[in-house]
Amino acid sequence: MSTYTYSAGPGMLPTEVMQEIQQHLLTFEYEGVSIIETSHRSASFQRVVDSLEWRLRRLMHIPENYAVLWLQGGATLQFSMIPMNLRKQNRFAYVDTGIWSKKAMEDAKHFGEVDVIHPLVDATGGMSFESSLVQEVDYLHVTLNNTIEGTRFTHIPEIDVPLIADASSNILAEQIDVERFGVIYAGAQKNIGPAGLTVVIIRRDLIQSLQLPSYLQYASHVDTLFNTPSTFSMYAAERVLKWVEDCGGVEAMERLNRQKSDRIYSYLEESTCFSPIVTGERRSLTNIPFSTGNQELDQRFERYALERGLLELGGHRSVGGLRASLYNAMPLEGAERLVDVMRAFEEETHVSHQNI
């Protein structure tokens, strides 16, 4: 019986990638020298760095007027680095779509005034915002996919200021038009690789030389390894990106993610035991919150699923309930298995209620 983890992060990695990593933990380029012992200044690791960047550029169609930076500190550090590096008038706009956008806003308040914009939901349940509210700010920040709430933007209007996107939970999982954005950033631990690595895709004209601590300046990281990076995470990410290419690229990943999420949403809509938390077009492809409507029953199902090899189905500690995260490495079989286990639990629960 296969075991699947539905964790919101770190997420699953492809089995074949982990098997290759396992081999290189003992020998990478030289016999007896591990990838985690390989110098970040060596020619062999520079090839990893170059391949990592070019694979991402190919997969996301990133043009040359954008720099690709590989940093540490998680997406959380970007909550501060973005206002630090992009401020001119010291006024920023944020679309408030949930807990992670709120965290980004709170950090931005250390560097200037924050205009809060509330999302709009249309007749189909799609999510957008009113562009006329974005005025006289240095940038507008959006969280493209809300990991906790299970929502995603379905339309982003044109605006006259740089658009900044937290893409941590949907990067490489669905197509993103990079040239719509000034900055796209993402923690690696959902769709790119292991934790410990953050990617920042930034339009070069936004990079300034500022009076900031050296690591916190984007300019310090352009086209160079400024300090010792997370070498293992970068190596693993390069292998994951190769796997994505071999699978057919981001278009293929998006098709698969739609299949997986459709399987689960379809079941939730017909179930008499479980209900989806989100309805309409704004439902996330990668993070599906759901519930029985009863905390004790939710916890019973979580234990029931764990006994059957389905891990990390608890909702975020701030909201409770249940959640299934379906990042790229989760196969279609993982979504189908979850539906089978939910259906079995529903049948057993219904029978037990009948026998009371």
From Swiss-Prot:
Catalytic activity: O-phospho-L-serine + 2-oxoglutarate = 3-phosphooxypyruvate + L-glutamate; 4-(phosphooxy)-L-threonine + 2-oxoglutarate = (R)-3-hydroxy-2-oxo-4-phosphooxybutanoate + L-glutamate
Residue positions binding L-glutamate: 41
Localization, UniProt: Cytoplasm
Keywords, ordered alphabetically: Amino-acid biosynthesis, Aminotransferase, Cytoplasm, Pyridoxal phosphate, Serine biosynthesis, Transferase
An example Gene Ontology CC term for this record: cytoplasm
Enzyme class: transferase
Binding residues for pyridoxal 5'-phosphate: 75-76, 100, 147, 166, 189, 227-228
Gene3D superfamilies the UniProt entry points to: Aspartate Aminotransferase, domain 1, Type I PLP-dependent aspartate aminotransferase-like (Major domain)
A GO biological process held by the record: L-serine biosynthetic process
Superkingdom in the source lineage: Bacteria
Its EC number(s): 2.6.1.52
Cofactor(s) required, per the database record: pyridoxal 5'-phosphate
Database matches in SUPFAM superfamilies: PLP-dependent transferases
Cofactor note: Binds 1 pyridoxal phosphate per subunit.
Record PTM N6-(pyridoxal phosphate)lysine, positions in chain: 190
Principal location class: cytoplasm
Annotated GO MF terms: O-phospho-L-serine:2-oxoglutarate aminotransferase activity; pyridoxal phosphate binding
Task performed by this protein: Catalyzes the reversible conversion of 3-phosphohydroxypyruvate to phosphoserine and of 3-hydroxy-2-oxo-4-phosphonooxybutanoate to phosphohydroxythreonine.
Subunit structure, as described in the record: Homodimer.
Protein name: Phosphoserine aminotransferase
Species whose genome carries this gene: Exiguobacterium sp. (strain ATCC BAA-1283 / AT1b)
Lineage start: Bacteria, Bacillati, Bacillota, Bacilli, Bacillales
